[in-house]
């Protein structure tokens, strides 16, 4: 009996099988030689090779988003608390020196203490919230300040002269306002005087003579304005013919 077996493959499929051994895919390029003896190598363009060479996932491309942000916040909080801590240490040392640290405190003293704690808390919140802004500003200011180091001796001498001229009125505050009120006024004016001295030192270091020059210019401008007001002549007096 004859076998009437008929192939189900069409002529197009047979032509495709013949072409696969000789034709080159233009997108993938020529196929490299594949060594079947090496178990680690895989035939190119296989599904397993595609999976092994898959691109990085979103988490691998963005590892920073999956990290914890608690540590930077604690660092910001610690750095923001540092200037407040230094200021409080200076105030405590001054009170200890005058033997007035939590001694004989009345209602007024405790009110001032509570107000001071509130100011420190608000300052800590403000410095933590605007951490990037004030740290960048301080960094730029320090760099600009250090570039003017040659002006520091002159600025220091001016601050020293400023302390001598204003020192005697400061010492008389205790005697003018009495022992009890003199302590409060002495502490307030001491802090104010220290801040003013620091500002004068910074201003004279960054721009030498800025305070003196601006003060002299302002006084000269005001004097010139006063002279012009008193010596100004109306237009009618200068041109009497215009009235006729």
Curated annotation (Swiss-Prot):
GO cellular component: vacuolar membrane
Keyword Secreted attached: no
Membrane topology classification: Multi-pass membrane protein
Biased composition (Basic and acidic residues): 17-30
Residue intervals passing through the bilayer: 73-93, 110-130, 149-169, 183-203
GO biological process: meiotic drive
SS bond partners: none
Residue ranges with Polar residues bias: 1-10
Signal peptide: none
Region called Disordered, residue ranges: 1-68
Location(s) in or outside the cell: Spore membrane; Vacuole membrane
Keywords of this entry: Membrane, Transmembrane, Transmembrane helix, Vacuole
Oligomer status and interactors: Homomer. Interacts with other proteins that exhibit high sequence similarity.
Function: Acts as a suppressor component of the dual wtf meiotic drive system, and can suppress but not confer meiotic drive by compatible poisons. Wtf meiotic drive systems promote unequal transmission of alleles from the parental zygote to progeny spores by encoding a poison and an antidote from the same locus; the poison is trans-acting and forms toxic aggregates in all spores within an ascus, wherease the antidote is spore-specific and targets aggregates for degradation by the vacuole.
UniProt similarity note: Belongs to the WTF family.
Name assigned to this protein: Meiotic drive suppressor wtf2
